Amino acid sequence: MKKEEQNMTNYRYLYLVIFLFGILTYGLGLAQPAQAKQNQNIMSNSFNSQVVNKARYTLSDETNGRMFLSSEDDFTSALSEFDLQARMKSLEKVSKAEYLKFAGAAARNWTPDERQKMMKAASKLQAELDQFSISLPDEILIIKTSGAEEGNGAYTRRNAIILPEDYVKKTNDVQMEALLTHETWHVISRYNPELKLRMYAAMGFTPCSVQFPQALLPLKITNPDAISYSYCYQVTRQGKPVKVAPFQYATKPYDDGTKRKEFFQYITSVMNAVNRKHEAVMVPSLLEVGGANNILNVWDVEGFDVKTFGTGYLIHPEEITAEHFVKILKKDFTHPLTEKLAKELQTTKKS
């Protein structure tokens, strides 16, 4: 066969292969189930995603953020009368439906610069998280809000990290990475309950049966990152050991007619003293002169302080753990508790 004929034959074979490949891939595309195509569309619309241990950080747009924030979950079910009024800055009682609508309306879109900033932080965090065998949801949403729905604080719900726009604008790259790491721990904790309890136990916290004092129920302040206050820690009071469960409540009903105060300004962090059977004593002594000592302030006991835990964020073992999680990933082992928790986390390392 002549060289020219050989070349022509080769081209024909090449065209045939390309043609057959095109038909095959087109057929496979038609054979995709409707749900798979829908998922493909969702994936393509989820801009700036970063895979983390089988999970994907996704910046939620305003529409999806509104849908997420206006839906019910464990957090919204736990909200007290004060929670609802203070978040909406209302002197009148607020219904759950009113709050959900209000929360949804706080969702905002991301600017191009914000997207770049967030994904830079997520990329660094991925490299750190990849070493651990931890369960994560398929998708970790990052929702930007006006901040009005949660007193301009960063928080989590289910598989979402919610950040107020002021935080997003004002934090530098290092601060954003630390903030995203802290909030990511709450998602990890939620999806890894056994790991969470091991980390709590390493700090000295154990599950216990605690009933919130009845007189304070309407004033209870709910932390979306940790809605349960049923974790006890042994401290010393007047030379004697006593188990306490930290919790938060408002000093008084919401009464700000100017609508300038955030609910954080009403917070009192105290501890509920429990007996050996882990049953809560329900008389709030500090609110009733001469009452039994059942509600204690942090300064009323020894062993529940910054020196003990290496952080001033003492409102819940979940927040203490999140602070140390940031230090672990930064390899800052200045405080001995950080190293202790790091060793516990090592048990989840990939082999």
Annotate each PLM feature.
Residues V17-G27:
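Bacterial N-terminal signal peptides
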Residues A31-A36:
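Boundary at the C-terminal end of the N-terminal hydrophobic targeting segment
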Residues K37-P112:
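N-terminal mature-domain "stem" immediately C-terminal to a signal peptide or N-terminal signal-anchor/transmembrane
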